[in-house]
Amino acid sequence: MMDEAKEFDAVSLGILWDRLVSITDEIESTLVRTSFSTIVSESYDLTVVVLDREGRLVAQGSHSIPVFIGTAPRTLKYMLQKFPPETLMPGDVICTNDPWMGTGHMFDISVMRPVFSTAKGTLLGYTMSITHLPDVGGIGFGAAASEIYHEGLRLPIVKLAESGVINEFLLDLIAVNVRTPESTIGDLRANIACNEVGGRQLVEFMNEYAIDDLSALSNAIRNQSELAMREKIKDIRNGTYDNSILIEAIDEPITLSCKVEVEDEKIEIDFDGTGGCVSRGINVPFCYTNAMSLYSIKCLTIPNLPNNEGAARPISVSAPEGCLLNAQPPFPTGARHAIGHFVPGLIFGALEEAAADKIQADNGMIDLLTVQGTHPDGRPISTIHFVSGGFGALHGLDGRDCLPGPSNMAAVPVEIWESITGMSVI
């Protein structure tokens, strides 16, 4: 259901909307330029968002990867349960890497900063960045863990800074639990810095256009996105469609199943029939399954529309609790992408007859090389190299090469990889 919204003419709404997206892109640029790890600075395993005072996603950075679609509002709700809006102060920064409150595994850190009016001191909204950390301790990145506790340091919702003062105890605690404290702490500070830049730019934007409350603009943007999504869903033939695939797991193959119901201007996706969780780190929390599902439908409908919460409203996603695509603690989730990346192909397979001219062929998927150890000069190493198989072909179009489908991260240049690891690529 759409929210009540102030009327904006099309030109004004377009200008204001673009400005908000440009703010997220500036946050992203700051994050990339100040980060220490190549997984952020080269591979762009990240997202940045602006949310309104009610915690609704208004704008998301242009380079955000699909697995982060829709996760920030959910994470913010958990954060505000712990630290209610009326208790927040300028300069507060809140973070968590909990897989079930964040993005599905502990290697992603979600960092949020509330934004306040400089004139009145009132809460205007929030900025949030999410990045894959180079290391979180534990067994390391991969599927080897048999419990979530093996995978590293799991942070509850906690203040990374309070009233502008960084929580040095928290940084020290993290530093002594990871293999690469310099790059890990450096990336955390980059998250703090980019959110500060984003907050400042959001205040300047609202002052420039005499906007006291972001909610009206937020409602207009999200309503427009919802209308666009509903109109495009109408192009998909009504009906109930299903698909199942058998994939390699750890000890034995496992089934992924989905049912997609298209009714006029809405879509329901259900993963009932999917196999259960396993004792290795390929289990997928629902937040990840939901993100991959939203991404799949967006690819078929309005791929060029900037991400916001409105476009997700006509789409509902469900998965039985305890199945592989709705894993619960203490199942490990470190390599949840190994299963989660099958979700778009599963959905596309179900809809191959209903939207044949829009369906994408299977992706080349993504392979990861994780390196942990010691550089020849004595420095500790914990880094990831993406091997990208490319995107599947579309109707009348070849697939894109060297992209880690279904994602939009970038491979680290060989020269940089050799420099940071001391290894040679032949």
Regions found by a protein language model. Give the residues of each.
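Glycine/proline-enriched, intrinsically flexible loops and inter-domain linkers
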Residues: 2-90, 95-119, 123-268, 272-426
